[in-house]
UniProtKB/Swiss-Prot annotation:
Belongs to the IMPDH/GMPR family. Pfam families: CBS, IMPDH. Keywords: CBS domain, Cytoplasm, GMP biosynthesis, Metal-binding, NAD, Oxidoreductase, Potassium, Purine biosynthesis, Repeat. Contains 2 potassium ions bound at each subunit interface. The second potassium binding site is not conserved and not observed in crystal structures of IMPDHs from other organisms. GO terms for cellular component: cytoplasm; protein-containing complex. This is Inosine-5'-monophosphate dehydrogenase. The active site is at C319, R418. Mycophenolic acid (MPA) is a non-competitive inhibitor that prevents formation of the closed enzyme conformation by binding to the same site as the amobile flap. In contrast, mizoribine monophosphate (MZP) is a competitive inhibitor that induces the closed conformation. MPA is a potent inhibitor of mammalian IMPDHs but a poor inhibitor of the bacterial enzymes. MZP is a more potent inhibitor of bacterial IMPDH. K(+) 1 binds at G314, G316, C319, E485, G486, G487. One of its GO terms (biological process) is GMP biosynthetic process.
Length: 503
């Protein structure tokens, strides 16, 4: 006989936080939003900790390399979408890992007998303005000079000018030995007023380039999420079909964490995928799993060895899984149920497995609710799709600037691997839509504004950390009338005057 749940499931919109005591030190500047990304034993620390509890969704229209770089600068992490070829996904991961490494392996290189046209082509392809000239045109050839925009011919139509005739030769370059520390390299850049400092070995082979822009950027971005080599952290999505080929390529490219991307993660296919990764890499490769919406699903993936588990089916703004298949659960109820099972699992095993709330976030305060209910971090699609750094184009519709946003279950994404249970047969219907979202500008400004709200609400609850919020939060269900009462009502808001229609 089928199991029935008597209580209806709820969304974040049906809850509010009740204020707690705010002490004198409860001010937003004192709030610490760091949170674990992967599982750890009681008494130990997670091997990867986010500095902010936000990650971008594994979607074509959200998480490309620009998004990954921008979010890592702010302390979060992106999961590069897997609905593309293995080679292109690995290339995106590689680009993020090498964007700011302190010591950067040059990806813009020419030989001295090449031309200005070649320099322009490389700069356009890589978006880098410093081109290394090596004897063989490789990243680690003998360094002969550099070409920057200051070396360009006055007449830019002289595209046949030889590189050897326009470059700044090695004899005029300031360089440093490969034993030089990053702090020492930055000091040289600062004192010599350089934009780029080539790092060479004893035989004049180019090893790396240290850029001034990376130093300047690090002074502004104090919250950057980087590895031990000062490279940005980046995640990548995988599926349960080609994981035997995709995972090694992503690991080789430098992915810091993987996540199985599926609309329904309560599946033996995910267990098989995790098992294969554990057999080949042990615990060195971190992999999340999901999505699930109840404690039973959590327990299955926890026992399978998942490093974190995602919660949510059908709650995304572009997801139509619920109306197509009748599968899913209200996001708030799902988080509450899964967190209860996670806490029980922790008591039984001493292993803390972070959970991610994926979907259902409409307003910024929903982020705070998800965290208060026990989520360790939040995966967002629509939220990040609005930003300049998302990989979609901007369009103007009825005078408003919009960005395209489509679901991985839409025909446009054609990523059927996410929306089946494995095997060879693929589904023939959509579980996502193709849409637009209002353009919101740069990621940095928007994330800062959203997290300021989260911090302020945490202070209202008397909490300075996410664990404190989860232990102190007082959460109440609200009626539909209370929801109306919570917004502006019985007035005509000035910026909405053109939309006013008397009853």
């Amino acid at each position: 006989m089928a199991k029935y749940y008597n209580e209806p499931c709820h969304t974040f919109n049906e809850y509010l936080l009740i204020p707690g005591l705010s002490t004198v030190d409860c001010i937003p500047s004192n709030v610490n939003l760091s949170t674990p990304l992967v599982k750890f034993q009681k008494g130990q620390q997670s091997e990867i900790n986010l500095k902010i509890p936000l990650v971008s969704a594994i979607m074509q229209s959200v998480s490309g390399e620009k998004m990954a770089i921008a979010l890592a600068r702010e302390g979060g992490i992106s999961f590069i979408f897997g609905s593309q070829s293995i080679e292109s996904q690995a290339a995106m991961v590689h680009a993020v890992k090498n964007f700011k490494a302190g010591f950067v392996v040059s990806d813009s290189n020419v030989k001295p007998d090449q031309t200005f046209a070649d320099v322009l082509a490389i700069s356009q392809r890589t978006t880098h303005n410093t081109v290394a000239v090596t004897d063989d045109g490789t990243p680690h050839g003998v360094l002969l000079g550099l070409v920057t925009q200051r070396d360009y011919p006055i007449d830019l139509t002289q595209t046949e000018t030889k590189v050897s005739d326009m470059m700044t030769p090695f004899s005029k370059l300031v360089t440093a030995h490969q034993d030089t520390k990053l702090s020492e390299a930055n000091k040289i850049i600062w004192e010599k007023k350089l934009n780029a400092l080539p790092i060479i070995d004893d035989d004049q082979h180019l090893r790396y380039i240290v850029f001034r822009k990376d130093y300047d950027r690090s002074q502004v971005c104090h919250n950057e999420l980087v590895d031990s080599q000062k490279r940005y952290l980046v995640g990548a999505g995988i599926n349960t079909r080609d994981f035997r080929e995709r995972v090694p390529a992503l690991v080789e490219a430098g992915a810091d964490v993987l996540c199985i991307d599926s609309s329904d993660g309560f599946s033996e296919w995910q267990k098989i995928t995790i098992g294969w990764i554990r057999e080949k890499y042990g615990d060195k490769v971190k992999v999340g799993a999901g999505n699930i919406v109840d404690g039973e699903g959590f327990r299955y993936l926890a026992d399978a060895g998942a490093d974190f588990i995602k919660i949510g089916i059908g709650g995304g703004s572009i997801c139509i899984t619920r109306e197509q298949k009748g599968i899913g659960r209200g996001q708030a109820t799902a988080v509450i149920d899964v967190v209860a099972e996670r806490n029980k699992y922790f008591e039984e095993t001493g292993i803390y497995i972070p959970v991610c709330s994926d979907g259902g976030i409409v307003y910024d305060y929903h982020m705070t609710l998800a965290l208060a209910m026990g989520a360790d971090f939040i995966m967002l699609g629509r939220y990040f799709a609005r930003f300049e750094e998302s990989p979609t184009r901007k369009v103007t519709i009825n005078g408003s600037v919009m960005k395209e946003y489509w679901g991985e279950g839409s025909s446009r994404a054609r990523n059927w691997q996410r929306y089946d249970l494995g095997g060879k047969q693929k589904l023939s219907f959509e579980e996502g839509v193709d849409s637009y979202v209002p353009y919101a500008g740069k990621l940095k400004d928007n994330v800062e504004a959203s997290l300021n709200k989260v911090k302020s609400t945490m202070c209202n609850c008397g909490a300075l950390t996410i664990p404190q919020l989860q232990s102190k939060a007082k959460i109440t269900l609200v009626s539909s009338v209370s929801i109306v009462e919570g917004g502006a009502h019985d007035v005509i808001v000035k910026d909405r005057i053109n939309d006013y229609h008397p009853k």
